[in-house]
């Protein structure tokens, strides 16, 4: 991964990411590097340009730890993991969920508190459902959010390497 401080890169929490193909297309259009981070091997299409695969081993949070460690201003982190989103925001990264939700410093506290409350209720047997199924509108919202994040970073002085 190019680690120049003024360049844009995309870091993907890839194990269960449903929008990897969209990330590859957007990154190619903007000539941006992508780092796919996973706990196991993830196939990358041959035509995907500038995509690096990082397979971490060890504990369940190893991929999250790697992404948090490499998060920085100019990085766009794609994750559905709320605690990882919080850690990446602390490092100055832009964070987008696969459903297109943009996490910010001003919203992540409430999102994290809600997640923790639902986890507690689920542990107590009060909540049995999970998130809504991934839908085409989520894919569209994600593409818009990713393009917006890249445009904002370019306007802020970051560039493709």
From Swiss-Prot:
<comment type="similarity">
    <text>Belongs to the UPF0178 family.</text>
</comment>
<dbReference type="Pfam" id="PF02639">
    <property type="entry name" value="DUF188"/>
</dbReference>
<protein>
    <recommendedName>
        <fullName>UPF0178 protein BCAN_A2024</fullName>
    </recommendedName>
</protein>
<dbReference type="InterPro" id="IPR003791">
    <property type="entry name" value="UPF0178"/>
</dbReference>
């Amino acid at each position: 991964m190019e680690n120049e401080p003024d360049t844009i890169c995309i870091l993907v929490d890839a194990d269960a990411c449903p929008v990897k193909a969209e990330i590859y297309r957007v990154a190619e259009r903007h000539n941006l590097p992508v780092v796919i981070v996973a706990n196991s091997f993830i196939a990358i299409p041959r035509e995907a340009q500038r995509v690096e695969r990082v397979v971490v081993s060890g504990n369940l949070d190893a991929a999250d730890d790697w992404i948090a460690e490499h998060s920085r201003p100019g990085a766009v982190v794609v994750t559905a993991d709320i605690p990882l989103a919080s850690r990446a925001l602390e490092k100055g990264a832009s964070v987008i969920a696969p459903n297109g939700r943009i996490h910010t410093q001003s919203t992540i506290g409430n999102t994290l508190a809600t997640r923790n409350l639902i986890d507690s209720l689920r542990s107590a047997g009060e909540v049995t459902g999970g998130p809504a199924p991934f839908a085409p509108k989520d894919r569209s919202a994600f593409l818009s959010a990713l393009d917006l994040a890249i445009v904002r970073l370019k306007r802020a002085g970051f560039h493709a390497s």
